[in-house]
Regions:
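Surface-exposed, charge/polar-rich loops and edge strands
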Residues: 1-186
Length: 186
């Protein structure tokens, strides 16, 4: 029994070190300088070590909103709001999670109103996030059950979209203004 406890103690310590290293890397990414989107999000997918990396991209919102049902923020139920952005530099589009809204006062069958994404060129800064697995649920028009990028792209009628997304931190229009947006998640 003592030998087993000894080995399990080292195993537990190794797990602690791995988690501490991962948490340190995530903290560095979360607070770090933003890098161009294409350095982190690629058509082959987000590398594990790049999760929560700050990215920036300039482009034009071209589709949305699509609402992610079954979300919560600070203990309140609601929806997250997704928009499709086409980068000015070309290449695949990227889905941007612009924030959180509470459900409509008229019930679950009515989607809430949200501030629109800005027209024209916008520079988005946020965190690279891995797309989610499909929950296999049929969703009403304009909604999805998870941030599964093929399902989101189908709801937005978008083609050529990256398999991962950006969680919005800030955005600025070409004239330097900050557009109105749903409640931030980051």
């Amino acid at each position: 029994f003592a030998v087993a406890c000894y080995h399990l103690g080292w195993w537990q310590y190794d797990r602690h070190l791995a988690k501490a290293e991962r948490n340190e890397r995530l903290d560095e990414h979360y607070r770090g300088e933003a890098v161009p989107l294409g350095e982190v999000l690629t058509p082959s997918g987000l590398a594990v070590q790049d999760g929560w990396r700050r990215v920036t991209v300039t482009g034009t919102y071209e589709a949305g909103p699509v609402f992610v049902r079954g979300r919560s923020l600070d203990g309140e139920a609601g929806l997250e709001v997704l928009w499709g952005l086409r980068p000015d530099a070309g290449g695949p589009g990227v889905v941007v999670n612009r924030g959180f809204v509470r459900p409509s006062d008229q019930g679950a069958s009515v989607l809430p109103s949200v501030p629109p994404a800005p027209d024209g060129e916008v520079t988005v800064t946020g965190w690279a996030r891995r797309g989610e697995a499909s929950r296999g649920k049929e969703a009403a028009a304009g909604t999805v059950a998870s941030i599964n990028l093929p399902e989101v792209a189908a709801q937005m009628a978008l083609t050529d979209v990256l398999p991962d997304y950006v969680l919005l931190d800030s955005e600025r229009t070409a004239d330097g203004t900050t557009p109105q947006r749903p409640q931030p998640l980051g």
